[in-house]
Amino acid sequence: MQRFDALMQHNSVGSVQLRGMTAAQANVVQRYAIENTRLGIPYLFSEEALHGLMTNNATSFPQQIGLAASFEPELGREMGHAIAAESRACGIHETYSPVMDLIRDPRYGRAEESYGEDTYLCAEFARETVLGMQGTDLTTPDTVAAEPKHYVGYGNPVGGLNCAPCTMGRHDVFSDCLPVFEAAFADGKACDAMCSYNSIDSIPVSMDHELLTDVLRGQFGMPGFVRSDLTAVSRLYDWHFIAETPEEAIRLSLIHI
């Protein structure tokens, strides 16, 4: 705990990764945040949980593409609830899931993470999975906040290459991809969102005001925050070459959410 105290007191730490932690360990860290930081803001413990919580001894369910092959969206709700219960038992409050990417290119190496290529089927599973995770009361000990990803157009990259620009134009993104997220946010009431690395019509999603604010918040009613997918913000500087500095990349993202 002394090492942790030194780390938190003398560094600008934005997040701490504690994979495989127990609820007891999470409580120790949480108590430190509340009692020893200037504002006393509790930490939000989040984790990957695509088809099961990413930790030892958690239940591993079929990948989403396998679940979608059942054509039974209610199974998504059952899986979501089971994942939520196991996550909360480990001290996790939020999951980086479910994946809402619509896959139209079989070369894409992460196709198994999605619910497939059909907008309607993906939307049905999206809503049910979120409802299973969040339930009707997030204060109960068997629910977590859902963070659907990757918003948006991430599953259709040029050449099937991960993170590459989306091959779909805005018309196809709005008509095919966004209804899946609408089901998760407007119907399922998902709390937060994770934005994607890709660009659509040369505009990086991580700084797309129309998608992040007008659509996600204005139309879909997303109440929480937008999390950048790992380096999605810094890539405005060293990948998309739009920002002149890393600081400018941060500014461009913040002013558009």
Which residues does each PLM region occupy?
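Glycoside hydrolase catalytic-domain context in secreted enzymes
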Residues: 1-255
